[in-house]
């Protein structure tokens, strides 16, 4: 039986990464799951991690950025995601294609139609079974980022950029309610995990 594919999404500072290992551990405790693979984008493979460093720290044309994102994703799907799903394992990815539509599409203004062409070419019919969108107001995200490490290229973007990115995430969630669950990530970790527990019980 094919495994399930779960993605975590949200603007920088939303706090999604705090919960990935916890969700993975909850799923590993289930007897009906053959195994759980955690991964991330950009990255997830040796080549993908090299591209991640370029994407996070080098300035480039917005179309170049999108193409590199999808190049890393193609390798990620071929080497990690698809093989794991075929073996019946569940895959949890910290970001996937929704992030490209939100950041390069919403944030940078790249035409959705161009991204859809790349999406169809790179992943075909592959879509997450569940996308957890961790949503916070910009003020909350900014405060969390200010207290964190030195920002990368995306984390250092303007408030307007992050507002457009958040708006695109929420638009996509409204467009695909069967796949998305929007998490109010301003709440305590305990409250968020209570909600995640209920969501996981449905898949």
Curated annotation (Swiss-Prot):
E.C. numbers: 2.7.4.9
Disulfide bond sites: none
Binding site for ATP: 10-17
UniProt catalytic activity: dTMP + ATP = dTDP + ADP
Record keywords: ATP-binding, Kinase, Nucleotide biosynthesis, Nucleotide-binding, Transferase
GO BP terms, alphabetized: dTDP biosynthetic process; dTTP biosynthetic process; dUDP biosynthetic process
Single GO MF descriptor: dTMP kinase activity
UniProt cross-references to InterPro entries, sorted A to Z: P-loop_NTPase, Thymidylate_kin-like_dom, Thymidylate_kinase
Recorded superkingdom: Bacteria
Enzyme class of the recorded protein, top EC level: transferase
Segments passing through the bilayer: none
Any one annotated GO CC term: cytosol
Function according to Swiss-Prot or TrEMBL: Phosphorylation of dTMP to form dTDP in both de novo and salvage pathways of dTTP synthesis.
Sequence similarity: Belongs to the thymidylate kinase family.
Protein name, per record: Thymidylate kinase
Organism: Cupriavidus taiwanensis (strain DSM 17343 / BCRC 17206 / CCUG 44338 / CIP 107171 / LMG 19424 / R1)
């Amino acid at each position: 039986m094919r495994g399930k594919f779960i993605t975590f999404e949200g603007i920088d500072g939303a706090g999604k990464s705090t919960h990935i290992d916890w969700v993975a551990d909850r799923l590993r405790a289930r007897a009906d799951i053959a195994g759980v693979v955690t991964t991330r984008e950009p990255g997830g493979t040796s080549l993908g991690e090299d591209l991640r460093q370029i994407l996070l720290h080098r300035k480039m044309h917005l179309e170049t950025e999108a193409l590199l994102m999808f190049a890393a994703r193609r390798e990620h799907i071929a080497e990690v995601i698809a093989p794991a799903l075929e073996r019946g394992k569940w895959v949890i990815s910290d970001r996937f294609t929704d992030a490209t539509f939100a950041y390069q599409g919403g944030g940078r203004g790249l035409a959705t139609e161009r991204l859809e062409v790349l999406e169809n070419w790179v992943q075909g019919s592959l879509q997450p079974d569940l996308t957890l969108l961790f949503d916070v107001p910009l003020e909350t995200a900014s405060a969390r980022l200010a207290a964190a490490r030195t920002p990368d290229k995306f984390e250092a973007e303007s408030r307007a950029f992050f507002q457009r990115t958040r708006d695109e995430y929420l638009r996509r969630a409204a467009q695909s309610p069967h796949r998305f669950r929007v998490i109010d990530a301003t709440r305590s970790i305990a409250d968020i995990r209570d909600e995640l527990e209920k969501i996981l019980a449905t898949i």
